[in-house]
Amino acid sequence: KSGLLHHFANREQLIVALLEDVVTALRQAVMQQVDASDERPGRLMRAYIRALCTGSQDVLRYFSPTPVWAGVLDFPEAIEVVERDSAWWAENLAADGLSPQRVLVVRRAAEGLAMAACFGEETQASLAEGRQLLLSLTEGGELPG
């Protein structure tokens, strides 16, 4: 405890720092997936899909099961970190050139796959299949069948 108090004045500051670290790690993981040669609409969304739908532990930390984060959002500073992050993603994905409807469906589907992977409900094969389908949807593709 004394080591933590040396770096953080209280529990809330520690939690805010942890949240900021997780938010930053996800954003960095997505940005590492941006294809600089891809100038088509949906470039950021494709990076988002590739980052979320690979099973990377760094990314899955962001989507850890709810009990891990229980009680974290009990104070304004933590809520502010999450709201800022959510607003950043909403703004940047909206400006990515895809229709708002496509952004909504593809983004939430990618997040759902990531969450399912956290619970061990997706195999690498099913993640790869979902990833390919979602990538296709960013390029105007339709659902099969």
Model-inferred region functions:
Residues 17, 25-65:
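Hydrophobic alpha-helical connector segments
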